[in-house]
């Protein structure tokens, strides 16, 4: 937890917050802080700054906060990802938030197991929890947008063209693929398939709306590794 995220209900006055639960436990056990110490804090979807500890005990943490810093800008990248298995989804959500991706779309595919869509990890609360962990790691306050698309063909034909406007668009797939570009600075969209990849029909449909196939290398990667490699290549170094 490199940043303590503050939510509206934490504020007891304009510049004062009271924290309990996980954040209190982290400050006690990891930071081992004391009254008079300062901690890095940020208001969710707002400014960042410091929090001066004015009270700290087993029941609560009270901070006087000074929020003056703008959070780091999001990368103008949309990741369209075939819904992975739930345990992998948790890690990918954290990664997306940590790396500053603007938007994540979780989409269905022929090789996505139907049971994945009934997972409790797809609830709004569960998704938000993992995104918060990613923001805490990166020292960011702004949540990425996450949307679900349970029907592949309607998403590609009706929704995807609008997302592609003004963006370079890539499909991570080895068929007739060029090398994945690196350190891109403009708006982009990248599509990554499920374990086993998209079926030929899905690849053709994605190509028909303007996606260019790119290769992430000769090795067969797990989905979360493919996400890390693709974003690592596409996002600018600075």
Regions found by a protein language model. Name each.
Residues 1-69:
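N-terminal positively charged helical leader segments and presequences
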Residues 27, 89-92, 202:
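Hydrophobic side chains in well-ordered alpha-helices
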Residues 43, 108-109, 173-176, 194, ...:
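Short secondary-structure boundary segments
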Residues 9, 68, 108-111, 218:
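Short, ordered loop/turn segments at secondary-structure junctions
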Residues 70-168:
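RNA substrate-binding interface of SAM-dependent RNA methyltransferases
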Residues 200-238:
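Structured adenosyl-cofactor binding patch, chiefly the S-adenosyl-L-methionine
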Residues 160-203, 211-214:
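Active-site/ligand-binding-proximal alpha/beta "capping" segment
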